[in-house]
Amino acid sequence: MNIIEGKLNLDSNTKIAIINARFNHIITDRLVEGAKDAFLRHGGKEENLSLILVPGAFELPYALKKAIESKKFDAICCVGAVIRGSTPHFDYVSAETTKGIANVSLNHNIPVSFGVLTTDTIEQAIERAGSKAGNKGFEAMTTVIEMLNLSKEL
């Protein structure tokens, strides 16, 4: 059997953008740091990493679409944090953000990763942003690196 998989290394010219939803910035700043750490650990150069800031998770799909259309990046890592409150707002924002990122990703020929936390509590978000459950920003960047390299093999 022939196994095809993406490697976890970057060449020195690879350009990746992190799109960060600033809302819940105490969490999302940690996700960005995790994503940056993964980029550098896997061989990326800091000057080839861009950070695009948007107000909240709902704005991620639009910024993703514009970033892809700019043709400046080889891959894009989206991060954010949507934390459940006492209204249905969480359900709408998390669902539409997920659908929007998926739709943009599938309609363009560029790897995109989804590092948007959707948690019931702030404690769960903190756990996923660098404490007990690792850093999902780091994982999202690792995923997009692997998918970028896989796309070169397919």
Curated annotation (Swiss-Prot):
The keyword Iron is assigned to this record: no
Enzyme class: transferase
Assigned protein family: Belongs to the DMRL synthase family.
Pathway: Cofactor biosynthesis; riboflavin biosynthesis; riboflavin from 2-hydroxy-3-oxobutyl phosphate and 5-amino-6-(D-ribitylamino)uracil: step 1/2
Known role: Catalyzes the formation of 6,7-dimethyl-8-ribityllumazine by condensation of 5-amino-6-(D-ribitylamino)uracil with 3,4-dihydroxy-2-butanone 4-phosphate. This is the penultimate step in the biosynthesis of riboflavin.
GO BP annotations listed: riboflavin biosynthetic process
Residues noted as binding 5-amino-6-(D-ribitylamino)uracil in the record, renumbered to the chain: F23, A57, F58, E59, A81, V82, I83, F114
Organism, as annotated: Campylobacter jejuni subsp. jejuni serotype O:2 (strain ATCC 700819 / NCTC 11168)
Binding site for (2S)-2-hydroxy-3-oxobutyl phosphate: S86, T87, R128
Domain of life assignment: Bacteria
Entry-linked PANTHER family: 6,7-DIMETHYL-8-RIBITYLLUMAZINE SYNTHASE (PTHR21058:SF0), 6,7-DIMETHYL-8-RIBITYLLUMAZINE SYNTHASE DMRL SYNTHASE LUMAZINE SYNTHASE (PTHR21058)
Name of the featured protein: 6,7-dimethyl-8-ribityllumazine synthase
Enzyme Commission no: 2.5.1.78
One GO location term (cellular component): cytosol
Active-site annotation: H89
InterPro entries xrefs: LS, LS/RS, LS/RS_sf
Sorted UniProt keywords: Riboflavin biosynthesis, Transferase
